[in-house]
């Protein structure tokens, strides 16, 4: 009888991937990136161990928002002071802070808790085509083949 393989945190091998977000719908990109961050693309996936890889997303400012999401999708946060509810649309985020728009979208698709926060730290988002992780020799990943 065979036993199920359970990954241990010390023996996980991690890769670096580069994903180009140009004209890719935000939700489809986020779900594919979240899957890689969790490690669900590996045969050694274990739900309670961080088996995921590092992901670098470039050209975040060129991500596609389909339909009327640029004006109708609203992100809320509160400053914990009376009357401190802040609201920004997805279009505002795409113009002013596209890195945060993509990070919020991916973070919402990761587990809630310490493991999800640990996995979210492996995401690196950049506005343009340049990034500072060339030393890690990242592998280019075509996101259209994953969706």
UniProtKB/Swiss-Prot annotation:
PROSITE patterns recorded: RIBOSOMAL_L13
Keyword hit for Ribosomal protein: yes
TM regions (residue ranges): none
GO CC terms, sorted: cytosolic large ribosomal subunit
Recorded GO MF terms: mRNA binding; structural constituent of ribosome
GO biological process: one example: translation
This protein's UniProt keywords: Ribonucleoprotein, Ribosomal protein
Positions in coiled-coil regions: none
HAMAP family found in the cross-reference section: Ribosomal_uL13 (MF_01366)
Role of this protein: This protein is one of the early assembly proteins of the 50S ribosomal subunit, although it is not seen to bind rRNA by itself. It is important during the early stages of 50S assembly.
PANTHER family: LARGE RIBOSOMAL SUBUNIT PROTEIN UL13M (PTHR11545:SF2), RIBOSOMAL PROTEIN L13 (PTHR11545)
Protein's UniProt name: Large ribosomal subunit protein uL13
Organism whose genome encodes this protein: Ligilactobacillus salivarius (strain UCC118)
Lineage, opening ranks: Bacteria, Bacillati, Bacillota, Bacilli, Lactobacillales
């Amino acid at each position: 009888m065979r036993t199920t393989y359970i990954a241990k945190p010390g023996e996980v091998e991690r890769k670096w991937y580069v994903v180009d977000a140009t004209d890719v719908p935000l939700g489809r990109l986020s779900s594919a990136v979240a899957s890689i961050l969790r490690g669900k693309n590996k045969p050694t996936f274990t739900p309670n161990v961080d088996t995921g890889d590092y992901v670098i997303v470039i050209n975040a400012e060129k991500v596609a928002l389909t339909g009327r999401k640029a004006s109708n999708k609203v992100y809320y946060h509160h400053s914990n002071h009376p009357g401190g509810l802040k609201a920004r649309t997805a279009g505002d985020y795409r113009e002013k802070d596209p890195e945060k728009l993509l990070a919020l979208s991916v973070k919402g698709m990761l587990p809630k808790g310490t493991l999800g926060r640990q996995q979210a730290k492996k995401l690196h988002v950049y506005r343009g085509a340049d990034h500072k992780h060339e030393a890690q020799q990242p592998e280019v990943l075509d996101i259209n083949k994953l969706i």
